[in-house]
Structures are given as C-alpha cells and as structure tokens.
Amino acid sequence: MPAYQVTGNEYVSLPAIREDTGAVQGLTVLHMGAKGLLELCGGDAPLIAPVVRVAGQEAMLAKLRWRRENAWVPVAQGEAQGLTVTLTYLCPLGERAFFVRLEAENRRDVPLEVWLGVRGQWTRTLHEVNETIALDGRRTQEASGWNNAFVMQEVAGLPLCAFAPIAEAGVKWTWGDMAFEGGDGVSLAPGGHACVELIFGVGVETVAAATSAKHLLRLGYERCLRQTLGWLKKRMLPAQDATVARMMNENLFFSFFFASGRTLDTEELCLMTSRSPRYYVSAAYWDRDSLLWSFPAIVLTDAAYAREILMHVFTRQIRNVGQHSRYIDGTLLEPGFELDELCAPVLALEGYLVRTGDPALLQEPCVKSGLSRILSVLETKRHPEIELYETFLQPTDDEIVYPYLTYDNALVWRVLLLLSEWLERPDLARRAGGVKAAVYRYCVREGQFVWSTDLEGHYDIYDEPPGSLQLLPYYGFCAMDDPVWQSTVRAIRSEAYPLSFAHRPIAEIGCRHAPHPWVLSICNSLLCGHADTALAHLARTRMDNGLACESVNEDTGECETGAAFATCAGFLAYALWSAAR
C-alpha cells in the first residue's frame, strides 16, 4: 500500500499526496448543500503531479525524502538527473487556495536546461459521506480573464464547485479536455537555483476559484509560509522527547484540519470523523468522536476555535444529540441511541471551562437549552427502579449484548454532577451518587467491573477501546488504586482475555468491531497508568504513516483498519501531551 502525506486548511484538504511521486491524487472540500465532502479526482492519473524536464526530456523524481515543517507543511526533497528538487505543498490558513512550489538546484558541473511545473486532470467528482458515489453532472473547462489561464467547474444544474490555477507571468499553461499542464523553463548554471510557484484555488463557481488563487498570488508565497508556520508554532505542544513531540504535533494538526473545517458554500464550521476519503466512514459527525477524542486537543491549543466548536454543537447538532451519526448539517444519518454520545457535549463543555475559565459560555441561550435537552433525553433512558441508564448501541456503534454499560453509566455519573452544579440542582448530585452506588452493586462481578448487564443476572466480560473501562479514573469515576478497577484492567490486559494481544509486539486491546490492537487503546493506556508500555507500542508502529488509524497489526504494527482517522489523532495528541506532563 502506498504511503501518503496530507495537508490542508479550513477549506481545502489534500488527503492523499503520494510519497513515491509527490502527486496529489485528489482534493476535498466540505459542502453544506451536499451534506458532506466533494472530492475532485484525476481518475486514472493524479489531479496534480509535479513535472521536471531536463533538456526537454521528463526526469523522474527519485529518492523523495519527506518532512513536515512545523508538524504540518509537507516538504519533499529528491533527485532528478543531476538536480536536487524540493517540492512543497502549502495551504495557508483561511484561504480557499494552496501553493505547489518546485525548486531545483543544478548539482552538475555543466549548465542544464530545466523546466519545472505540474500536470493534471479533473475527470471525476465524488460525493463522500461514509459511502462514495461519482457525480454524473457536467464538468466544464474554459478560458478565463480572471487568471489569464483557464477555469474548471462541476455543474449540477447550478455550479457546485470550481477549480482554477494561477501563476507568475512566466508560467505557460496548456489545457483541454479537463486536463492541463503549466510551468516555466530556465537555463541553470552549475550550482544555480530555479523556482516555480503554482497556485490552485477552489470556490463554488469559477470567479470564486480564480480570485481565491489570485489573492494568494498577491499575498506571495513567503508571506503565506511565514504566517502559516507562525500560526503552527504558536499552537505546537511541548515534549522533552523529540520523537514524542513530532508524533504529538503531527497528529494534533491532522485532527485540527481533518476533523473540522469550513464549508465551501456557506463558510460554516462543521465537525466530522475525517475529511479524508481514505477513512471508511468519512465526512459525517459523531458526538463521541468529535467531542471526546478530537476536542480535548483543540481546547489545549486554540480556545477561541474550541468555543466556536461548542457553539456549533449546541446549535446545528443538538437536535439529534445522542443519535448514532449525523450529517454535517445536523440532520440524522444513522439512527440508534448511544448513551456515551449523549454525554459527550457535557464532557466537552467541562473540558472547555476547566481549560479557559470562561463561564460566560454557560449563559448562552443555545447552551442552556441544549443542556436541558440532554437531560430530558437522559430521563427517557433511566431504569424505572434502579439508577442506571440504558443504551441501544455500544461505543463502537455495534449492537449491545445487554443494555446497561458500566462505562456509559460512569459518564452519566459525571454528567449529572456537572449539571447539578451548572443548573443549580442538588437533586442531580444525589442521583449521581445513586448511579455510582448502582454501578458498584450491579456492574461488579467476581471482583471486577463487567462490560454490560441486563440487571437480571446476565452480564459480559468485555471491553471496547472507543469506550474502555480503563478510562474510569480518567473521568474521575474511581481512583487508580480502586481494587475493582485494578482487577478489571488486569483481566482485560491478561493473556486469558482473547482480545488483549498480550505478549504480542503491540499488546493493546482490540474488540469484535476490529479484532486487532486499537490506537485508541494506546491512548487509553497513556491515560490510565500504562504510559511506558504505550510509548513502546507506538515506537513499533507507523500507524498510517505516523498518523492515527483505527487498528494496527499486533505483530507488524502496520495499519489494519481505519486509515486517516482524524478524530482519533486528536485523542492521541492529547494523550501524549498528558503522559508527557
């Protein structure tokens, strides 16, 4: 499987830059009207590929070595017939456009005629929300005075999205049949340098795309690079170990830009599992994923953005809170109640208040009404006699065995305590005490916490990394020296537990949803007193080229499921930061 680099900003994502060639396979934009992602693809060829010619002959880029400037801007350096070539993809903050920059240095002792540029084609537009379908609309390509080149757009009755290049005057473009090539030639003396910067803009229609590119041209590459690197540096999290710092910050920015973004058509902030179509349920919203995993890292690094996220959750997403998954506009995608997802907005709000000390958010009308809605839904899930609450689906989104989950009710305990304080309702604190007592009475068997029970004598011993019993101390439900919790963790991490992968190179917990060690389990280990083993496991896996995936092979550490798992990347960054402290 090829390795990929990624980058992007709020509006544009480049989710699949091939490491072997440097080519962009496609780009994605969020579209509120389409309720998900639109991907512009090249089909059997890349959307954008770097091209180098020496003496009129195409020279293959070889031995590409990649780095991520300030943990996010991908830069490759390689060789091509006596040239050292550097390729950079830069998506400046807040812009609907990006740079492709090619630099060449002549390492030979004779002059070289060098041409630097790109080649590409837009032959398909894909709509992605969990599933992928190809649009059967009309794509157009025509000359434009806005960029002195051409513009391309997808038309579905009205324009849906558009794509346009621009460059300095020396760059020459050829185009036709939804394909294009553009670049510039120069004679390079020995030791000489050359550079070409090509800009691509996106928009709902052609004028927006062309002028978005033109705006970047006016700003200039160096200014945009300086501002972007400065923005990233300000938000990077510290760690003494350089390897941990790199992994933490690369996953932080991957989550920041791929688990949230702004729509091309309405410019609204929205949240999703991943803006990469390489993730198997991309471009849809889960309360759990966005608020329990991605959000803790965001609130560490950008309080204003975290506040905007919560306002989005308590407006766009609150109507269907607790339901399995939703479109980015808040309407229902997959039905099915999940108790941990109902709790997620409250827990995220707590994280924001603790980090920022900004109680004013609690006075926002949408937050007040949203908390009331969460409480009213919670009431409908309460057992008629016992202070425990049921769920329909588990934290993996799979069907339950029994309806009363220990982990879920630990979250309910926390939520009731918080709502008691925020809503000034002492009765909720008493109910929280009742939940804890009921968990210890009904959800403990053989000296350990069970996974779930029907309250009629049946229970199961199990664990799921997306909602692990290992996290009970993390949420404050019990202490790490609680003998019941310690017994539970020993049991699910022991060789006797079939999904523990104990004594394998990656000895982290899996589950039936994906029967391999989960990266979320590594996160859980970092947070529950097993940081040393978790860091050792991380050292043995590349995950998805250094970025979080769902699960990895227990022996090789290769990605098994869920590549480009952006919300998980946020939780990994947060867990690494917590462990580094």
Annotated model-derived regions:
Residues 214-274:
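An acidic-aromatic substrate-binding cleft motif
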Residues 1-239:
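Terminal accessory carbohydrate-recognition/targeting modules of carbohydrate-active enzymes
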Residues 195, 199-214, 279-280, 325-327, ...:
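The feature captures the catalytic groove of carbohydrate-active enzymes
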Residues 280-384, 409, 563-581:
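Aromatic-rich carbohydrate-recognition surfaces in CAZymes
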